[in-house]
């Protein structure tokens, strides 16, 4: 259902991992660093992360504590989909169990956005769920467009339609941010 309850206990604290069955994608989620650990069974969702979240460089993650840790596809025979605010370590932690019901990229993306947004709110910052593009018109004039809304509201589709219907007028379109800023 895409609603992730908060738990008062770290959901990954006592978990055991076979390192041959897991990958880590160090994602840049806005200005935050998220280590996304995904089971090899969910490779399709894991590699798709690069379409939405830029891969952090080694310089950006080496010897640095992440702001968020997300374990996706843990084989526990349950349907866990929790997040935890680890105040002691100043980070967000999340777990999503391996389950056919969760075998969908939206579950990976939405939990990451939930962690990002809760962390930003806790830091007294306003998370933006939207996108911004900078358009250079054929005349050379530059315009910025921000599209905001709930999940499924049509933000990405709106930007795609701007590209299609504005093609004759647009010289260049640069995505400033997509999904959060």
Task: Please state what every model-predicted region is.
Residues 137-168:
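Glycine-rich phosphate-binding P-loop
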Residues 1, 117, 151, 176-178:
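Residue-level signal for functionally critical sites in structured catalytic/ligand-binding pockets
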Residues 1-143:
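A noncatalytic interaction/capping subdomain that flanks phosphate/NTP-handling catalytic cores
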Residues 105, 126, 151-155, 176:
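Active-site-proximal structural scaffolding
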Residues 96-97, 131, 150, 178-180:
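Fold-independent oxyanion-binding glycine-rich loops
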Residues 169-181:
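Short beta-strand-centered segment that lines the nucleotide-binding/catalytic pocket of NTP-utilizing
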